[in-house]
Amino acid sequence: MSTHDCFSKEKPVDMNDISEKSSVVDNAPEKPAGANHIPEKSAREMTSSEWIAEYWKGIKRGNDVPCCCPRKMTSADKKFSVFGKGSLIRSIQKNN
């Protein structure tokens, strides 16, 4: 049986370093730079038509909503916005 101590290589935790890092997190701005506009209402409080309106505002800006990762609008998005938007809204309204 081996008596090797596998934890001997771990560095001790520096509590000062941890408090410095946590203060950076605590003082972070509420919205990161370049983040999409997030409506004041949460998704649970929004009606389906309000949510779709926010979604399409983001697509027209070239972003996915509610994701904060920028993405260029593709030709498929443009075609869907013309042909599919109405049927999508109608199908959601039927389900509500």
Swiss-Prot record:
The keyword Nucleotide-binding does not apply. InterPro entries: ASFV_DP96R. Signal peptide: none annotated. The keyword Lipid metabolism does not apply. Keywords: Host-virus interaction, Inhibition of host innate immune response by virus, Inhibition of host NF-kappa-B by virus, Inhibition of host TBK1 by virus, Inhibition of host TLR pathway by virus, Viral immunoevasion. One of its GO terms (biological process) is symbiont-mediated suppression of host NF-kappaB cascade. Residues 30-96 are annotated as: Inhibition of host cGAS-STING-TBK1 signaling pathway. Residues 1-45 are annotated as: Disordered. Residues 1-20 have a biased composition (Basic and acidic residues). Inhibits cGAS-STING-mediated type I IFN expression and NF-kB activation by inhibiting TBK1 and IKBKB/IKKB. Inhibits host TBK1 phosphorylation. Belongs to the asfivirus DP96R family. This is TBK1 inhibitor DP96R. It comes from African swine fever virus (strain Badajoz 1971 Vero-adapted).
